[in-house]
Amino acid sequence: MEQDRTTHAEGTRLSPFLIAPPSPISHTEPLAVKLQNGSPLAERPHPEVNGDTKWQSSQSCYGISHMKGSQSSHESPHEDRGYSRCLQNGGIKRTVSEPSLSGLHPNKILKLDQKAKGESNIFEESQERNHGKSSRQPNVSGLSDNGEPVTSTTQESSGADAFPTRNYNGVEIQVLNEQEGEKGRSVTLLKNKIVLMPNGATVSAHSEENTRGELLEKTQCYPDCVSIAVQSTASHVNTPSSQAAIELSHEIPQPSLTSAQINFSQTSSLQLPPEPAAMVTKACDADNASKPAIVPGTCPFQKAEHQQKSALDIGPSRAENKTIQGSMELFAEEYYPSSDRNLQASHGSSEQYSKQKETNGAYFRQSSKFPKDSISPTTVTPPSQSLLAPRLVLQPPLEGKGALNDVALEEHHDYPNRSNRTLLREGKIDHQPKTSSSQSLNPSVHTPNPPLMLPEQHQNDCGSPSPEKSRKMSEYLMYYLPNHGHSGGLQEHSQYLMGHREQEIPKDANGKQTQGSVQAAPGWIELKAPNLHEALHQTKRKDISLHSVLHSQTGPVNQMSSKQSTGNVNMPGGFQRLPYLQKTAQPEQKAQMYQVQVNQGPSPGMGDQHLQFQKALYQECIPRTDPSSEAHPQAPSVPQYHFQQRVNPSSDKHLSQQATETQRLSGFLQHTPQTQASQTPASQNSNFPQICQQQQQQQLQRKNKEQMPQTFSHLQGSNDKQREGSCFGQIKVEESFCVGNQYSKSSNFQTHNNTQGGLEQVQNINKNFPYSKILTPNSSNLQILPSNDTHPACEREQALHPVGSKTSNLQNMQYFPNNVTPNQDVHRCFQEQAQKPQQASSLQGLKDRSQGESPAPPAEAAQQRYLVHNEAKALPVPEQGGSQTQTPPQKDTQKHAALRWLLLQKQEQQQTQQSQPGHNQMLRPIKTEPVSKPSSYRYPLSPPQENMSSRIKQEISSPSRDNGQPKSIIETMEQHLKQFQLKSLCDYKALTLKSQKHVKVPTDIQAAESENHARAAEPQATKSTDCSVLDDVSESDTPGEQSQNGKCEGCNPDKDEAPYYTHLGAGPDVAAIRTLMEERYGEKGKAIRIEKVIYTGKEGKSSQGCPIAKWVYRRSSEEEKLLCLVRVRPNHTCETAVMVIAIMLWDGIPKLLASELYSELTDILGKCGICTNRRCSQNETRNCCCQGENPETCGASFSFGCSWSMYYNGCKFARSKKPRKFRLHGAEPKEEERLGSHLQNLATVIAPIYKKLAPDAYNNQVEFEHQAPDCCLGLKEGRPFSGVTACLDFSAHSHRDQQNMPNGSTVVVTLNREDNREVGAKPEDEQFHVLPMYIIAPEDEFGSTEGQEKKIRMGSIEVLQSFRRRRVIRIGELPKSCKKKAEPKKAKTKKAARKRSSLENCSSRTEKGKSSSHTKLMENASHMKQMTAQPQLSGPVIRQPPTLQRHLQQGQRPQQPQPPQPQPQTTPQPQPQPQHIMPGNSQSVGSHCSGSTSVYTRQPTPHSPYPSSAHTSDIYGDTNHVNFYPTSSHASGSYLNPSNYMNPYLGLLNQNNQYAPFPYNGSVPVDNGSPFLGSYSPQAQSRDLHRYPNQDHLTNQNLPPIHTLHQQTFGDSPSKYLSYGNQNMQRDAFTTNSTLKPNVHHLATFSPYPTPKMDSHFMGAASRSPYSHPHTDYKTSEHHLPSHTIYSYTAAASGSSSSHAFHNKENDNIANGLSRVLPGFNHDRTASAQELLYSLTGSSQEKQPEVSGQDAAAVQEIEYWSDSEHNFQDPCIGGVAIAPTHGSILIECAKCEVHATTKVNDPDRNHPTRISLVLYRHKNLFLPKHCLALWEAKMAEKARKEEECGKNGSDHVSQKNHGKQEKREPTGPQEPSYLRFIQSLAENTGSVTTDSTVTTSPYAFTQVTGPYNTFV
C-alpha cells in the first residue's frame, strides 16, 4: 500500500476531494457542489470558502481520495471521477493508503488520518470559520453512517476544488466544484452534516444521512476500510497506548476514535496500537457524526476537547492523511492548539502519534502491509483499507463515535453530551478541512492511520454540529485552551517539537529542511525520526504524512488523541506539565488560532510547526528562517506531513507546491482556526496531560466551554456573521470565517497546493521544525496538532517526506516561514497583542489565561487565527479530503505514539519549564535566529496584522512560485486573505491584537533583551540595533512609549540628559562593570574600585564661575590599583544601563619616568615654552585670575603635536613643509628634539595601557594610524594620539574638548610636585580633576550606604565644605600666550597682503604725530589709571548707565597700563572686529599689544566708568583686545584698544564688562587737554561700538543721550551728540561729517559712533586719526591712532564693525571707502584736530611699548571674595573630583563630558604643583602629510573664487578671499554704503558750528537720541 501510495501518480490516486467514495448518499454530488463551493474555483472563491464545511465533507473525500491516492489502484469512484487530484489538493490523496482503496476508502482513511493528524483540525478550523458549511460538508463527505467516504468523496471533491492538485480525479472535483459553485456549499454542507451525523456526531438527519451515504460509498469503494465495525471504539478505548489514535479519535470524535480516545484519555495505556489511529478516528467520526458526545461528563474538558478535536479532525482530511500522527497531533492540537497541545500531544499523542507515526511511518508501510490489519482491531479493512482505516473508522465511528464522544465528553466535561460532541465535531470539522487538506496532500501516508477516521469523525461531528457548534467548539477550545494555558504547553511542545523536528529534519529525505528541524530537540528526532524515516520511505505516506501532518498540526483529532493520550498515558509531565502546556498552549493556541487561519494550507505541518514554532519560534528561529521546505527539511515535521508519501513524488510535489501555497494560505487561514482549535485542544491537551487536574478545570471550563463552545459553535454556525460582526472569538471567528469562506478557496487552492506545496510546506514546516510544525498545526488544526501532532506527524511525515515531504515541506515552509515569520514575529509581536485583544474578546478569558501563562503564544494564537483565517480559505478542502489516511496497526502506532508522547511531554515539560520562564526566552531565540529566518519571519514582529496578512500573502506567493503553483491560486488565496481581513471581525480583532500597542508590549519586553544583546556589542549602534524588533515598533510608536511600557529606555539614549557613550565600557549593572574592568586590568578584588556617580546637569562652580570640588576621590591604599567611575543610567535595564565615564589608573607610568618627565618638562617649558591661549583659562566673564596674578609664573598650557585647525579644517600643519610638532620659543632645535623625544616616548608607553583599559576607544583612535602616520605620536605600532597639551598649574575651567575625535577619549598623565608623590600624603596645595556635572552616589558599588560612609570616614572619599576664597579680578589682560606673541608676524603677513595705499598714507600721517601724541597719551594714561583705579571695573560696572559712566569717566584719571591677560585672542587674523576692519592696523596693534606691550599695558580709559575697558578685552584674553592705544588715554586705551574691537563680543557678551570691549572710542588717545576726551568715556563708547559693532548693537547700547554727554564735554554743541543708535548711521554720520568737514567738528559728528561721550573733539581726532587709514600698519607697533580710530569708525560706519570689521579685506574696503568718501578725513584736518589725533596716535603707539615693560603693574586687580557656599547648599549641584597621584593615568571622554581642573592656590609654572599631560587625537587627522590634500583643495577652490571675483572688482575679490568676512558682511562694498549714509546725513542734518568746530546737526542736536535709526 505504501509503495503504491508512494509510487502511484497523481492521477493514479484519487485525491480526497476528487475521489468521493460513492456513498449511498450520492456523496459525489455534494462533493461536486462542495468542491465547487469549497474548491478554489474561480467562479465561487468565497462560496468555496463559505463551503469550508463542504471542505469537511471534502476532507472525508480527501481522506478517501488520499487513501485512493495512496493506493496505486484508484478504486475510489471519486478518484475515478477525477477527485483524486482534488483529494490530493485537499489531502484526499494523502489518505490513499492502498492502491485498491485509493478511491473512496483512502479518502476516508485520509480523512480520519487527517483528522488524526490535524487535517480534520484544519478542516475543523475551516469549519470553525465556516461552520455551517464545513460542518455540513464534513458530515456529508467523510462521516457517512457507513463510514464510507461518500462524504469523503464529497470532501475530496471540495478538497479537490480547494486543492485541485490533490484532485487526481478532477472529474469529481469539478462536479463538486460545480455543485458547490451552483449552491453548493450550503446544500453540500447540509448533506455533509447529515453524513457526519451518522458518523457519530449529533447532527441533523440530513447530515447523518450524508455521512451514512458517504460511509456506504466508502464501504463500496473501500469496504474494508469503511467497515464501521472495524473502527470499534472499544479497541481504541482499550488501546490508550495508541494515544495518537486516541488523540485522533479525540480530535475526530469519530465513533470508534471517540471511544478509543475516551479510553485513551481515560486509560493512559497505549493498548490500541494495533488499531490504526485512523480507524479510531474513523470510528469516532462515524460515531461522532451520529452520536454527538456520548459522555459529556466523563472527561468533560478532554472529552469536549476530544469531541472538538474529533469534529476538527473530521474536517481536515490532511490530518487524516497524517493518520495517527496527524490525528494524534490533531488531538494534541485540539487539546493543545498551540505548543501545549503539541507538547502534550508530543508526549502522549506525539508518542502515540509518533508510534502511530512510526506505525504510520511503518504504519503507512503497515498500512500497505496491513491496511486492514492496523485497522482490523477496530475495523475490518483490507491492508489498503487499513491504510484507509479512516474509512473503516467511519464505519465504526458510528459505534466508536459514541464512545469517543463519551470519552471526549468525559474528558471535556465542559461540553454537554451532544453539545460536547457537536463542539468536538465542530472543532474537528473546523480542523477537518485542514486535516483533509493535509491528508489530501498525503493520503497514502496517512491512509494506514486513523486520521481518516478523525476526518470522518470531524466530518461527522462537523456534520452533526452546526457550523456554530463547530465554532463553539473551536471557540470553546480556544477559550478553554487558553484557559488551560496551552501557550505554555504549546511552547513546551513546540520547543520539544522544534528540537524533535529539527532532529527529524536531518532524517527527512529532504535534507534541505533538516537544518531547521535539526535544531529541534534530538529527542524528537530519535522518537520520531524512525517513524519519519519509515514514513519517508513511503512516498505516498509522505503525501499522506504531509497532509496528515498538516491536518495533525491543524487537526483537532491529533490534538484530541494527543490529549487523550496524555490523559491515558498519564504522562509524568502530562498533567503536571499540562497546566504549563495549557498555559503555553493557550497563548500559542491563540496565536495558532490566528496562524491556523493563515496556515490552513500548510497547516498540517504548519500548524504543528506553529505550535512548535511558538515554542521553537523562540527556540528555533533557523527553521523559521528557512522559507522553503528544502531549506528546512525537518524530518520531525515530515512525519506530520505524510501526504507526500501518499502522493507520488511528482504528484506530491505538484500537490505539495499547490498545497503548499494552499496550505500556506489555508494553513495560514487554518493556522488561525488551528490556533483556535489548537487553543481549544490545547486546553484539552493541557487537560489531557493533566486530565485529572484538567478534568476539574475542565469541569469548570467545561461549563465555560459548554457556553463558549456553544457560543463558538454559534459563531461557527454564523461564520459569515462572525466575519461580519462577531467579535466573540476573534481567533475562532476568524477561523470559522476563514475556514468557512476562505477555507473553500483555500481548500481549492490547497488541493493542489497542499498536495505538493502542502507536502513541501509541511516538510518545510517540519524542517522549519518550530515554524512549520507550529504553523502547520495551527494551519491545519488550530488546536493541539502543532504541539501533539507536530512531533508524531513530523516524525511520520519526515519519514514520509524524504522525497516529497521535502518539497511540500519546502513549500509549506516557504509559506510557513512566511507564516512562521509572520506567525512567529507576529506571534511574538502579536502574542501579547493577540493576548490583549483576545482577552478583550470573548476568547479573552482563554486568552487571558494564555496570556498570563504565555502572552506571546496567545498573540501567536491570534496570529495563527489570522494566518489560519487567511489560510483557511485555501485549506478547507484538505481538511475534508484527508480524513481516511492512516490505519496502521493501532497498537504499535499508538504505543509508539504514546511513548513518544510521554517522552515528548517530558522533554517538553523540561523545555516548557525552560521556555516557560517567559515567552521572552522564546522571543529571544527569535531575535537570535531571525538572521537565519526568512524575511517573513521578521515581518510580523512589528507590523500590524494587515501587514501580516500581506506578508503572509507574499510568503504564500513565494512558496507558490517555489512550488510552481499557479499564481492564480496565490492570488486567490491573497484575495481570500484580503477578504478575510476585510470581512472577518475576527480578522479585524486579530489586527487589533496585532495593533502596535500590543506589538509594543512584546517589543518592550524584547527591547530590554535586544538592548541586552545588542548594546554590549555595539552600544552606540544598539540605539537602533538593540532593539531591531523594538525599533520597528518604536518607529511607529511614540518616542516615550517604550519607556512607558517597557522597562528600559536604552533604545533612546538621546533621551538621557547625560552624554551617552560606551567606548570606555558599559554593562547591565555595576557587577558587570567590575567583571569587565577586572578582565581588562587582570586583577580582582580590592585592586578594582568602582564608584557610582550621578549626573545632575548642575555645574558646580564658584560665584565667579570658576571650578570647585565638593567631593574628592582619593586613592585608599596601595592595594587599590584602578578607580572606575560609572554612571548608572536611570530607568535602564539594558546592556548599557551602567556606563564607564572615567578610568583612573593610579600607577599609570613608572614613578621614575614620571619624576624625570616632571623635571624635564619644567625645565624646557619654563625656559622656552610658548604658551597657548585657551578659552578655558578664564571664567565666562574673563576676569578671573585662576592662572595666577604674575604673568611670569602664572599657570599656562603648551600644545605640541598635531591638532585640528579650524582654519584648515584639518591638521594645523597642513601647509607646513617641515612641521615643528614640538615648537619652542626661538630657534632651539635641540630643545625641541629633547622635548619631542620625551613626549614621543610617553605616548609609546601609554598606548598599550590605553589599549588595555579602553580597547574600544583605542581601536577607534588607531583606525587611521596608517593613513595619517604624520599626525601620530609614538615610536611603535599602535599610536592612538596625535597631540599633547602640557598644563603647568593651569586651571582649566569647565569645558569639553569638542575638537576631539568622535568615539575617542583623552588620556591625562599627572606629574606631581615632590611633596605630592606619596600615597595618602596630603600636600599643602594640589589640583583636582573635576566632573562638575556629577555628584556621588549615596551608596557604594554594592548598594551599601554603610560602605560609602566608611569610605568617607577612611578618607578615600573626601567631602569638602563651602569656602570663601580671596580672588583677584584682573582689569588688565594677562600675559599673552605664545600664540599671541606670534601674532605680530602673522599680522604683518596679512597686512602686507591687505595693505592699501590709503592705509599707507594714513599710517604715514599718523606716524607724524607720534611723538607729540605720545606725551599726551602718557599723561592721559596716568589720568586714566587714576580713574580706573576705582574698583568699579567689575562687569556690573560696565552696565552702569551712561550718566554714571560719564560721571565716573569725568572723575577718573588715566591709569597705568595694565598687563594684558595671557588670553588675548590669537594674531589679528580674522579675529573679529579690529583685525579685519583694520586688517593691518588691528593686526599690528593686536600683535604689538599681544606681543608684549599693549597686552600687558592696556588700560581702561580714565574717562570710562569702567576703568577696565581694556580689561574687558583682557577678560576675553584676546591679543587684539589689548589696548591698541593703552597709554594714550583711557579713551585711547579702551576705545582703540585692539582687544576691545578685536573682540566685538566682549561688549556683546559683557555689556557689564568693566572694560569697553571695543577700543574705538576708548582707544582713541586724546590729549589731556581735550575736555571732551577727558570727560568722554571711551570705554562706554568702545564697549558700545565694539559691543554693538552693528547698528543694532549700537541701538541696543544703553547710552545716555549723546548730546548730553557731548554737551558736557563740548559745552552745548549739539553736533557733538552724534549718537546714532546704529553704527552704520554713526559710521555714516562720521563719514559724512568728516567728508563734509574734516574738522574736529566732523570728529564731533563722528563721536556718536562710539558713545554719547564721544565728543566732537574726540570725533575730530578720530577723523583725523588714521581711521581714514584703517589699514595702517598696526603690526609695526606703530599703531597709528588715527588708523585705529578710522578703522573703528569705519567699521562702525560700515555696519560690520563687529562682524566684518574684523576682516582685513573688509577693513581694506572700509579704509578705502572712508579714504575715498572722506578724503578730508584722511587729509583735510584742521591743525588742532590733526594734532589731537596724531598726539593720540603717537601716544598710544609709544605707550604700548611702554606698557609692555609694565606688564605686571599694568594689570589692575581687584580683590574679592569668591563664595561657593551655594554649591554646597544644593545637593544636586555637581563637583565630583579625583585627586590624581604622581604618574597616574586618567582616561575619560573629554569630548562628551564637561571637565575642569581646580585652581592652584599658588600657581608657579617654573615649579608647578601639577603637570598634566593631556594626550588626545583631534578630529579630521586622518590624511597623510598632515591633511595637505585638504588644504590644497581648499586653496585651489579659493584661488578659483578669487579669480572669478577678480573680474568683479577688488572688493568683491576680498570678500571672496575672506569667506568669513563675506558671511559677516551682509552688504556689498563699504563705499556705496558710506556714500548712502553720507547722503542721508547731508539730507537729514545741517551743520552747526560750535566753538571752532563745525559739526553736522543731524546728530549734534539733542533731539537725536534713542536708537538713532532715523538716519539709517
Curated annotation (Swiss-Prot):
Disruption phenotype: Mice are viable and fertile but develop chronic myelomonocytic leukemia probably caused by dysregulation of hematopoietic stem cells. Mice lacking both Tet1 and Tet2 are fertile, with females having smaller ovaries and reduced fertility. They display decreased 5-hydroxymethylcytosine (5hmC) and abnormal methylation at various imprinted loci. Embryonic stem cells lacking both Tet1 and Tet2 remain pluripotent but lack 5hmC, leading to developmental defects in chimeric embryos. Zn(2+) 2 binds at residues 1106, 1184, 1186, 1293. Zn(2+) 1 binds at residues 1048, 1132, 1134. GO terms for cellular component: chromosome; nucleoplasm. The lineage of its organism: Eukaryota, Metazoa, Chordata, Craniata, Vertebrata. Its main location: nucleus. Residues 690-701, 907-921 have a biased composition (Low complexity). Changing residue 1205 to R: No effect on interaction with DCAF1, monoubiquitination, nor on 5-methylcytosine demethylase activity in vivo. It is an enzyme of class 1 (oxidoreductase). Belongs to the TET family. Changing residue 1231 to G: No effect on interaction with DCAF1, monoubiquitination, nor on 5-methylcytosine demethylase activity in vivo. GO terms for biological process: chromosomal 5-methylcytosine DNA demethylation, oxidation pathway; cytosine metabolic process; hematopoietic stem cell homeostasis; hemoglobin metabolic process; hemopoiesis; homeostasis of number of cells; kidney development; leukocyte differentiation. This is Methylcytosine dioxygenase TET2.
